[in-house]
Amino acid sequence: MRLKRLSTNHLLSIADLDREDVETVLRVAERFKERYLAGERVIPILEGKTLGLIFEKPSTRTRVSFEVAMHQLGGQAFTYTKQELQLGRGEAIKDTAAVLSRYLDGVMIRARRHEDIEEFARYSEVPVINGLSDLEHPCQALTDAFTIREKLGRGPHTVAFVGDGNNVCSSLALVCATLGWDFVHAVPEGYECPDRVWREVERRAEESGSETRVVRDPKEAVREADVVYTDVWVSMGDEAEREERLRVFRPYQVNEELMSHAPEHAIVMHCMPIQRGYELTDDVADSERSVIYDQAENRLHVQKAILALLMG
């Protein structure tokens, strides 16, 4: 499989990618999935190469999908928590990045602070991938775009995100604007995406000819939506605000009543883990509209594409 390189050495943010990069990732992921479903479980593009996975936050889908992805590409993945490394005892990020670059061919980091991943990339001689930070979740957003196309075609589409303007929402808004898809965010005042992200979303939307809107009414957001997306109300790191967030976001629950205002063809997405009965009810999560498990599966194929394009 011949692969075209991306225009970036790292994947820290969707803002690192132009439209051609995004299309390349989606196209390569499609080829990987087709071959996987045809029974070709190992494609040794990264044979002999190693990926380090560093986790400051817990993970199920990100950890397992990256470990399996490296195996299916013929390489190896080594997983560490921050506390297992000298980072946990105060070693400078600069020194850790420089040293790990001598051992590994790539590093994926899940960190609390986006700035820590940016600093790591600054001193790394090998590709660095953001596996989730407080600002963005680019691997998830690329997977979401892949899943939307798989279910609904190339588009353009209208994506409604109902809930907190968190890392998942930020990256999804950026990828939608990049692809020329309309994005509507239903959110309580004060919980919108960070200004630095939204400015880039608006710039890309203007460039691609798509529309981005922030509304307060979830029913308005889903009325013309092809995709209704939600995520947890209390993200990792927001636990101290739990009770207040549960109160504020209660009217933003994705349930049967809200979905009755969406078009019949609209699909429901969630990056998982789900706090069932809060942001998403069981009857919707387990309905025919829900694509949550396909979405989770696609992390594997999209991340194989990301790894192959950055490390191949």
UniProtKB/Swiss-Prot annotation:
Binding positions (L-ornithine): N167, D231, S235, M236
EC number: 2.1.3.3
Protein's pathway: Amino-acid biosynthesis; L-arginine biosynthesis; L-arginine from L-ornithine and carbamoyl phosphate: step 1/3
InterPro entries to which the protein is assigned, alphabetical: Asp/Orn_carbamoyltranf_P-bd (IPR006132), Asp/Orn_carbamoylTrfase (IPR006130), Asp/Orn_carbamoylTrfase_sf (IPR036901), Asp_carbamoyltransf_Asp/Orn-bd (IPR006131), Orn/put_carbamltrans (IPR002292), OTCase_ArgI (IPR024904)
Chain residues that bind carbamoyl phosphate: S59, T60, R61, T62, Q86, R110, H137, P138, C139, Q140, C271, R299
Domain of life: Archaea
GO molecular function, one term: amino acid binding
GO cellular component annotations of the record: cytoplasm
Record's keyword annotation contains DNA repair: no
Main subcellular location: cytoplasm
Family stated for the protein in its record: Belongs to the aspartate/ornithine carbamoyltransferase superfamily. OTCase family.
Primary role: Reversibly catalyzes the transfer of the carbamoyl group from carbamoyl phosphate (CP) to the N(epsilon) atom of ornithine (ORN) to produce L-citrulline.
Protein name per Swiss-Prot or TrEMBL: Ornithine carbamoyltransferase
Origin species: Methanopyrus kandleri (strain AV19 / DSM 6324 / JCM 9639 / NBRC 100938)
